[in-house]
Structure formats: C-alpha cells, structure tokens
Amino acid sequence: MGVALTRLAQWTAAGYETGTLEITPLNESILNEITKFVESFSYKYPQEAKFVFVEPLEWKTYLEPSAFELGYVVSATTAESEETGKDGQPLLFLSVPYIKVRSFGQLSQLLSIATDSKLQEAQACIEANRDPVVKILGPDYNEMKEDPTRLTLLDTIIKDKETYMKRKVAILLKQLDLHLLNHSLKYISLEISLNPGTFKKDIELLKRFSGKGEQTVLESIEYTSDYEFSNGCRAPPWRQIQGEICYVLVKPHDMETLCLTCSTEGVFLNGGKTEEEGEINYERKGEIYKDLVTCLKDKSPVFSENMSKHEIRFTEEQQKDNQIFEKPKTEDGHSSVAGSEKSKIEKISFGKSPMTKRLEPSLNWRVTVDYKDHKSSIKDSQEEKQGKLEKSSSVSVAPSRAQSHRKGGEKVEETVSESSSESEEDEEPPDHRQEANADLPSEYWQIQKLVKYLKGGNQTATVIALCSMRDFNLAQETCQLAIRDVGGLEVLINLLDTDEVKCKIGSLKILKEISHNPQIRRNIVDLGGLPIMVNILDSPHKSLKCLSAETIANVAKFKRARRAVRQHGGITKLVALLDCGQNSTEPTQPSLYETRDVEVARCGALALWSCSKSHSNKEAIRKAGGIPLLARLLKTSHENMLIPVVGTLQECASEENYRAAIKAERIIENLVKNLNSENEQLQEHCAMAIYQCAEDEETRDLVRLHGGLKPLASLLNNTDNKERLAAVTGAIWKCSISKENVIKFREYKAIETLVGLLTDQPEEVLVNVVGALGECCQEYENRVLVRKCGGIQPLVNLLVGINQALLVNVTKAVGACAVEPESMAIIDRLDGVRLLWSLLKNPHPDVKASAAWALCPCIENAKDAGEMVRSFVGGLELVVNLLKSDNKEVLASVCAAITNIAKDQENLAVITDHGVVPLLSKLANTNNDKLRRHLAEAISRCCMWGRNRVAFGEHKAVAPLVRYLKSNDTNVHRATAQALYQLSEDADNCITMHENGAVKLLLDMVGSPDQDLQEAAAGCISNIRRLALATEKARYN
C-alpha cells in the first residue's frame, strides 16, 4: 500500500508531503480498491481484524456520533467503541470532528456506517496518514523480502502470537500493494492512446464542423501556438515533461472562450491566457476528461445539442481519418511525450508479480503484419468468404473471417427433444446495443481503443492490448458490451484460429470472463466460436484445453449452444478430458503434472455440467463412457473437482438409464461420503443427486446402508443456505418413501426439525419439507409427533398458496394427518376441510386429485361428517361435476371421495339428484385398475339410495363391471364383488351378470382368503341363484 500511494497516487501541486489527492480516474480507482479491501477485511480475515495498530490512524471525519449505534458508547460530541485494546483504550474514538481508529475491524465497521461517504472517508484518512503502513505495523518493521503468498514453517510455530499476527497483517498489506500496482496498469497503459496524432485528428475534425452558423458545433477552435515540434507536440519542452501535448482556445456558441490543455492523461480546463503577457496559466482548474469532445459536451449544452445532430457524420469522418492516421508503428513523437511516464513506471518495483511477465511481448512471432498486410488480409478474407481461397493463419485477422468460418462450419440442425430441466435462458433475450448518445463510462471508450490495436496493430500491440484488456473489470456489462460493439468478439474468436499459443490463451481468458453475459454468449455462438473452441480441446497444451472447456461451460447455457457443442463432437472430447492424465505428453514434474491433469478434468466436468441440461447431450455423455470416468473422479479429494462432477451427475440422474448406471458404478456411496464435506456447495449438489436418484427403492436402501440419512438429518439444522436446504429436504423427502428410512429419521429427530421448517422458508424448501412430512405421516407415531410439535396449523395455513407442487404435497400431508381423530379435530377447527374442498376448483389436475384424496380421511374421521359436507354451499355439485374430467387420477380420487360422501343418506340423495349415477356409469369402460377399484366402491355405495340399482343397469354399467373380475388386482376384485352384490338386488342386473359370465368368475373368488371378497361373491351368487329358482318356479306354476 505504501509503494502504490507514493509512486502511483496523483497529488496536487503542493506535493506528496503537504498536498491533497487530485480528482483523477487513477486516484478514484486506488481509493475504490482500498475501500473494498478494508470493507471485506472483517469477514475474510476475522483474526487479523482484531490486530491493534501500533499508532492509531487519525483524520478529520465527516461522520456524526449519532451514526454509531450497536457496539458503541455515544454522546452528543463523542463516540467510542465498546471493543478495547489490551491497554483498555477504545479501538475507535470520535471527538467531533476528529476520529482515531486502531484496528481493521473498526475500520471495516466505520466504512459500513459511512455508506455514501466511504470514499471521502478513505481519502481523508490517506491524506492525513501519508504512510499508514508505518502507523499500523510500526517504524521498525522492515519490508518483507520473502514470498508474500505463503507463511514459512517458522511463522506457524512462532511462540509470540502478537508478532505472528503482525506478520500476517504485513503480508496482507503487501498483497494489497501489489494488487494496487497491477490494477493501476490499465490506466497507465491506456495513456498510449492519447498522443499528438489523436488530438490533431480531433481538432481538425472539429474545425470542419465549426463556424458562425447556428447549426455548427463551435464558433472557432485554434491552437495557442502555431509552432509544432518534430514529435507533433505544441507545448513547451518543460511542459512536455509533464505529459502535456498542446493548448487550444475554444469558443462555444453559448459561453466565453475556453483554454484547454490536451495531455497524455486527458483534457482539462487550465487557468487561461493572461491579457498582458499572453502567457498561459498551466494550473488545472477542473476534472480530467477522456477527450476533447467529452470535455466540450460537459462544458457547453449548445455544443452537446448540435453535436448530437452531426453525430453520424462526425463518426464517419473519424473513421476515414483513422485509416489515414492510425498506423501500427509507434510514432517517435509519442515515445518522447510518454517517456517521462515510462520512466515513472519503470521505477515501480513489482517484485515477482505475474503481471510483469504477462505484459512482456513475445519475440517468437512467425509473421510480421503491417498496415498493408492488414489490408490484404481483409481482402483475402472477403474472397475466402466466397470460397475462392484457402484459409490462412495470421495473428491479426479481419472480423469478417468469423462469419465466413461460421457459415462454412454450420450443419443442418437436427431436430432434438430437449430436457424439461432446460429452464435457463431458453428464450432469446433482446440484444441491447449501447445508444450513440448514452452517457457511457470512460472504460467503454478505453476498451474500444484497445480493440483497434487488436484489429490493426502489430504483434506487440496485440499482446499488450490483450493483457491491458484483461486488467479491466470484465465482469462489468459496460466493459463486455464495449468489446462486442466495436467488433472485438470477431477478432478474439479469430485469434483462436491462429497457431500462436499466447494469442489463443489471451483471447480465451477474455472470452471466458465476458461469456458470463447472456448476450455475449449468443454472439459467440452466432460468430461460430464454439466449433473453434471444440477443436482446441484436442490441443496438446493443457492450459488451452482448460480455458477452452471453461469458456464452453459459460457459453453452453442455452439450447442452441448445447446443441452446437454436441454436433461438432464436443461431448466426446469433453468426456476424454476427464481421462486426460493417461493421454498427456507434456513432460513436467510429478506434482505439477498431477495438478494440471486435475485442472483439465475439472474444466471438462464444468463444461459437461452445462451441456448435461439437454436430454440428447445426457445420452451422448453416457455413450461416450462418461459415467465410469465421473465415478472415478468422484473418489478424488479435490473439492473444486467434486462440485462439477456431482453437478453433472445430478443433472443426468433425472434419466432412468443414468440411475441404473449410477447404482452399477457404486456412486451412491461416494455421494453419501461427500455429504460430510465442509463445502456447502458440494453438500448441496450431493443432496440434489440423491434426490434425483432416490426415486428408485434400491437407491433409497443404499443411502440408508451407507449411513447417508444421519448427515442429511443433521444438515437440516443449518438453515442459512437456502439452496442447500432445498436440496437436503428434497433428498429426505424421496428417502422417506421407504418405511425403514422413516424410522431412522424419527431416531435422528428429523421430523421435529422438519415441522420447524414449515414457516419462514422459501417455496422451494417448503415443497420438499411438506412432501417429506406427507410420507412420514403415513405412520401413526409420526402423525402424533407432528401434532404434538404444532405442525397441523402451519400445514393448514399452506393450503391457501398458489404453488402447484406445494399444494399437491400439503394436501397429501393434511390428508395423512387427518387419519388420526385428534389431528382431524384440529384441521376441522382451522377450517382445513373447507380449504381442501376449495382446491377442487384448482385448474391443475394434480392439485384437484390430491385434494380429493385428502378429503377422504377428513370425511371418514370427522365427528359429524354428513352435516359438515352439506355445509359447503355447492360442494356436492362440484364433486359430481369432477366426474366429467379426462384425468384418470382425478376420476379415481373423486370416486373415492364420493364413496365416503355417500355413507350419509342425505348426501347420497343430493348427489343422486346431481346425476352421479349416469356419470359413474359412463366411466365403467376403463382399463385402469386404480380407477376400477374406486369406481366400483362408489357404485356400491350409491346403490343404497332409491332406484339407483336399476338406474346403473339402465345406463349399462353392469356388464363392464363383470369384466373387472378378470383383473389381476385383488383390491379390484373385492370392490367389484361388493358392487355386483348390491346391483344383484335388481333382477335385470342379475340377468345381465349371468349373461356376461359373472357366476363362473365369482365362484372362483368364493375360495379367496379375503373374507370381504368371499362374502360379497357368495352374496352375489346367492341373489343370482334365487332369481333363477324363482324363474323356474314361476315357469312351472
């Protein structure tokens, strides 16, 4: 931090000792980085945050004592922290307006309190404490010469804890210093763009658009000096040392003449020309702008307005001038202007910073590209697009090549069925382009200038431009779109098609970062980037393989990209990366060799994880032999490897073929083992994989046998990570389908914990929690446990939701609890039955069916069920009308509900009036055994009112019922025999049964071990026999 502040921070003319920080982009960047570092210090380094500074940092603050709340003793003019050092002094003391801070923990807390004024506080602190490192560590603490990235063995066994802690803080400060130096390079490297040629172009252009008319942008613009030095500068030599290039007098339409300084740092307003001597006051009077046009737009509203009218024409003129002025060779004038800055940079000691090495241009270039070669390259690529020339390799290639490559490589898209799990970015989002007049940050324009070097520069410029571009925050959308808008994506993709490894690596590193943006992803696919990346997977260079696979992982977030990867053979190559250790030819040290292999496999797994959201890709992974390799990688101890591996398995486990293979490869054992990991993300994906696989009974048993139920139950206690909680509760839900697992969960107190999760949780968690309770409550002991833990009320409260999956599960859980009379009383008191009944109107068939099933135990166990059902206005009519549904599950559940409703004679009369008999009869011709059983039971019950027996015969329900006796389901036999017994009370029905062969089938069932079936079959045969005897008797009489 000390080196960065002394050598890079820009101070006012008063100098480093007494001046203040200037308002410049570089200073603002340094302040932002320091603020981020201090803000995150408390939670990143909790032990180091407690270290007490040798001397307090003291400055004049903008904060008031009232801003400090918890953990502080506050009065009208003072505030002090309750936290104190060994000497009993507070670690933070504010006496308006001065503040003293003695630890990073308190500094971090202060910045969180400051919110909007945190940068002001940071600036005031740095200006008041010119060498903060000395105050923090003491004047005798020498600068470290060791590697700052690791502690030595001596450090770990040192007895003096205070010295040890000071050492760790010193390392962190050294790392911050290096970070600030590296981070500042992007501002220094971009000064290369501001040279005499740049300003000369801009001034000449503005002159063309200036004059006396109202539509002109300016009245006049001219240099203060007509003399031009050989290097292109017009500033005096002693000012050129400061980076100044020239001075211009600008007369806008709406204000007095402005005197502007054009320098390598930008454009700013100076003190103007003195009237007597005509000398220029060089002192800066305002902020620095990135160029002349931006400065004038800010100063003059009329200029801004008129400029917007001429924007297109002005841009065209600029592009014409670029072809004249822009040359890849560095001008001599430029080097002399930037000389002082270069010497300033060279003085900075970067130690062994990786940035230094990264900025060194390669000397081993195969081809030299100058301006003429570049023009011919464009011409070649245009001919190539028409198929007239063969593809050639070059470092700097034209943007049009990306398009020709794409068109040549495209195949006819096959029609594929994509997985239902593909919910991510399947819709094409609108392509947002930056507006011409948008108020864009300086980074946007700086990146665009770098892209120009990529397009037309020589090899050195290409490498430096790639390195400089990476120093920007490429996670920002502005930076990503800046690369795209100026044609940088095409260039980056074409650099992948060269033979230069460094160019490929630099390009892939940038593409990897910016491909997190959905628009950029789609642009990469449109430009044919994926086939090239897939080909790079065959490269012998492991670093290239890694970067290519990681970029594919980012891009393959939508259907078209996943399909493209598969169509170009990417799945097979990615699967091969999982086994790359056996195919490697790079001679390296054993430890490094193993590490690189692990990294290659990890990146391959990441890409497969993204691709595995497609059904066709899942099948391709399986056919390529991916499952055994994933199973082998699952045994590794590298957590960063395990996460994508388990993530891929989790996606693929939705397919039945995969679940069988997962069992065969004994993957469940390793999934269970990794549930005990400390990594929350790994726990989440393991639980999710178990959730997918536990549809199978054998898998549920394996989870129990390998001890997976206990860690699942223990993970329920940590509710902070909602994604992990959803995965864990999902795994518990599916495992609870097996009764043996439910017993174990009861032992581990999981049911009580699940009840506690019924409130204040997101729907993703609630669906699984309620599903698990629904399965657990099939057992009597668990129903009692849920009631005693107060689980009934939150379950009933969830009946008013709108989430389909949640409603299906909660109705099942409420229905399971309703089996117990005491729980049923609570449900009735909370108006739960009415809520269930209202769900019969839900548009989703699954919700209707689940609600109808839940009503069955409610009606069966209610104290006055008949009266309760009749109290629901229109409720019986609603139930009867549901018999018109096309959904078999809805029909079966409604028939079951009618069976219970019809136990009350008054209710039976009402549903008969609503036409239940013809609707039930209409359903008789079904082959679904579940529906057959409950339909037969409903018919049996409905026969007990009036002439319903006769009506069923008239509606031809008897003959289909006889066929039910041929089913293989004993439950269907019993229900059918009971229905036929009731129907056989009518003579015409007996005749129909006899004609359809019922007697023979019923005789076979009289010998059944099921007593109810025996009695019903015998009773039916008895009625048929009595009718036959009566007929015989009548004939002879």
UniProtKB/Swiss-Prot annotation:
Q: Does the keyword Acetylation apply?
A: no
Per its UniProt record, what SUPFAM superfamilies does this chain match?
A: ARM repeat
Concerning InterPro entries, the annotation shows:
ARM-like, ARM-type_fold, Armadillo
Question: Which coarse location class describes where this protein primarily resides?
Answer: cytoplasm
Repeat found in the keyword field:
yes
Localization in the cell: Cytoplasm, Cytoskeleton, Cilium axoneme; Cytoplasm, Cytoskeleton, Cilium basal body
Q: Which UniProt keywords apply?
A: Cell projection, Cilium, Cilium biogenesis/degradation, Cytoplasm, Cytoskeleton, Methylation, Repeat
Q: Identify one Gene Ontology CC term for this UniProt entry.
A: axoneme
Q: In which tissues is it expressed?
A: Highly expressed in testis. In males, also detected at lower levels in lung, brain, liver and muscle. In females, detected in ovary.
Q: Matching SMART domains, A to Z?
A: ARM
| Span list, region Disordered | 316-353, 376-439
**Residues that bear N6-methyllysine:** K545
Please name the Pfam families in this protein's record. Arm, HEAT_2
- UniProt-listed GO biological process terms: cilium movement; determination of left/right symmetry; heart development; outer dynein arm assembly; regulation of cilium beat frequency; ventricular system development
Which spans of this chain does UniProt mark as ARM repeats? 477-516, 518-557, 528-570, 615-654, 656-695, 739-778, 821-860, 864-903, 905-944, 946-985
UniProt feature, compositional bias: Basic and acidic residues: 316-334, 376-391
Oligomeric and partner information: Component of the outer dynein arm-docking complex along with ODAD1, ODAD3, and ODAD4. Interacts with CFAP61.
The UniProt entry, under PANTHER family, shows: ARMADILLO REPEAT-CONTAINING PROTEIN 4 ARMC4 (PTHR46241), OUTER DYNEIN ARM-DOCKING COMPLEX SUBUNIT 2 (PTHR46241:SF1)
User: What is known about what this protein does?
Assistant: Component of the outer dynein arm-docking complex (ODA-DC) that mediates outer dynein arms (ODA) binding onto the doublet microtubule. Involved in mediating assembly of both ODAs and their axonemal docking complex onto ciliary microtubules.
Q: What is this protein called?
A: Outer dynein arm-docking complex subunit 2
